[in-house]
């Protein structure tokens, strides 16, 4: 009955005084829990981890602290329960520090294992840029390898043009310097057979022109010869005609002279 009377009297207080008292007791309880947790976890975990753990425990147990303070206000004479609750909080803080230390050690071991795997592994994502840069080669390397990508640089282009002129695909080599005098001269390839009209129709234009060059020249020569022969024939005919005319004139002259002599006699 006395407890019920005390609870009724407490409910009659204004809300502002209740909140003020609750805040004071919450601050005192949080200070005590921080002291106990720091003393218990100083042997296992360094200082920065203690602060994090204490903040987590205080954030998790705010509702429990409020309930305990209400119970303590209702029973002002009974402070043993608060000490028991603080003991529970200290044990919980020790467990959390132990778990956090074990988790940190596991994480460190995992990091070490990952580093070891990266050292022994063939695939390294951090070296992607270097691998890509190795694909780009100069003009000379790309020409020697026959593959790979070529990065454009004005210096490389200038050196390429200086080293390889436009007619570098048709090099002029003097084989006499490296030719052994005891070696026989290489034989010429066999002469290709003459192509007929049907076969020549399937050959390219430049091949046809090279093959038909001599017949054209021969035909032109034949035409010139025919023209010359015609001219000679005309000249011979003219000379023969003149000779015949001269002979006819001589015959007439002789005949007329004979007749004239016969008439006089």
Curated annotation (Swiss-Prot):
Biased composition (Pro residues): 183-192
Protein name: Tyrosine protein kinase-interacting protein
Entry membrane topology: Single-pass membrane protein
Residue ranges that the UniProt entry lists as topological domain Cytoplasmic: 1-238
Domain comment quoted from the record: The SH3B/LBD1 (SH3-binding) region binds LCK SH3 domain and CSKH (C-terminal Src-related kinase homology) region binds the kinase domains of LCK. Both motif are required to activate LCK.
Basic and acidic residues bias locations: 15-26
Organism field: Saimiriine herpesvirus 2 (strain 484) (SaHV-2)
UniProt-annotated location(s): Host cell membrane
Biotechnology: Used in cell biology research to transform T-cell lymphocytes. Saimiriine herpesvirus 2 transforms T-cell lymphocytes, including human, to continuous growth in vitro. 2 viral proteins, Tip and StpC, are essential for this function.
UniProt keyword annotations, A-Z: Host cell membrane, Host membrane, Host-virus interaction, Membrane, Oncogene, Phosphoprotein, SH3-binding, Transmembrane, Transmembrane helix
Principal location: host cell
Region annotated Disordered, chain positions: 1-49, 172-192
Record's keyword annotation contains Cell membrane: no
